[in-house]
């Protein structure tokens, strides 16, 4: 069973790419440098307190704004294991999978609280809130998208495919 388990960081609606990684830090593409500033304009303590495996839960329109790949790169480098939101900007959705960051749409995201421990069952499409005992259903990620995540993103996936075809 393919499961992601982590503690929740809670954010609201319309978290755009400038809040995820402010434009003033786009002079680098080093993931570790970006991670030092991820979400700092939304929560100044986030970069120092986020831990590997943590999960962001947000409202509508997560990742709107400019189509920078820096946003999912920064989240992933900071240790964020997944993002759950009511909806995502389409370009952020695609960029996240291309970078190997799993994201999930869940209209009931406001029922999950900051600090809750949740388990995301990728195979069965279930988010289980360990603290409340409540389960939420989502449409499972297509197999190809799961392969992108498992490979660490589109570039790594393509490299693996090239190795297999030699």
From Swiss-Prot:
It comes from the Bacteria. It catalyses: (2R,3S)-3-isopropylmalate = (2S)-2-isopropylmalate. GO terms for molecular function: 3-isopropylmalate dehydratase activity. Pfam families: Aconitase_C. The keyword Amino-acid biosynthesis applies. SUPFAM superfamilies: LeuD/IlvD-like (SSF52016). InterPro entries: Aconitase/3IPM_dehydase_swvl, AconitaseA/IPMdHydase_ssu_swvl, IPMI_Swivel, LeuD, LeuD/DmdB_bac, LeuD_type2/HacB/DmdB. Its EC number is 4.2.1.33. Heterodimer of LeuC and LeuD. Catalyzes the isomerization between 2-isopropylmalate and 3-isopropylmalate, via the formation of 2-isopropylmaleate. Belongs to the LeuD family. LeuD type 2 subfamily. This is 3-isopropylmalate dehydratase small subunit. It comes from Nautilia profundicola (strain ATCC BAA-1463 / DSM 18972 / AmH).
């Amino acid at each position: 069973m393919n499961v992601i388990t982590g503690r929740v960081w809670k954010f609201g609606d319309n978290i755009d790419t400038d809040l995820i990684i402010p434009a003033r830090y786009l002079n680098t593409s080093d993931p570790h440098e970006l991670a030092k500033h991820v979400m700092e304009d939304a929560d100044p303590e986030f970069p120092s307190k986020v831990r590997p495996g943590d999960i962001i839960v947000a409202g509508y329109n997560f990742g709107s704004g400019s189509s920078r790949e820096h946003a999912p790169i920064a989240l992933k480098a900071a240790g964020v294991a997944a993002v759950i939101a009511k909806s995502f900007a389409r370009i952020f959705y695609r960029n996240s999978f291309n970078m190997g960051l799993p994201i999930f749409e869940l209209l009931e995201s406001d029922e999950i609280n900051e600090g809750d421990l949740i388990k995301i069952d990728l195979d069965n499409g279930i988010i289980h809130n360990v603290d409340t005992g409540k389960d939420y259903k989502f449409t499972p990620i297509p197999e190809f998208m799961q392969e992108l995540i498992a490979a660490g993103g589109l570039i790594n996936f393509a490299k693996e495919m090239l190795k297999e075809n030699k």
